[in-house]
Amino acid sequence: MAAKGAREKIRLVSTAETGHFYTTTKNKRNMPEKMEIKKFDPVVRKHVIYKEAKIK
């Protein structure tokens, strides 16, 4: 059996408070800090910062 991987599913939530989010994975060993990335929010039709949140 293979060992469990270091990648974990995360949710990127818009800081524009629209409720829009993206899902992705990240490697916890290489990036232990919370991820912040600028992506397009189709609700406000602008690029905004998305912050990492746990998937429930």
UniProtKB/Swiss-Prot annotation:
One of its GO terms (biological process) is translation. GO terms for cellular component: cytosolic large ribosomal subunit. The keyword Ribosomal protein applies. InterPro entries: Ribosomal_bL33, Ribosomal_bL33_CS, Ribosomal_bL33_sf, Ribosomal_zn-bd. Gene3D superfamilies: Ribosomal protein L33. The keyword Hydrolase does not apply. Pfam families: Ribosomal_L33 (PF00471). Belongs to the bacterial ribosomal protein bL33 family. This is Large ribosomal subunit protein bL33. The gene is rpmG.
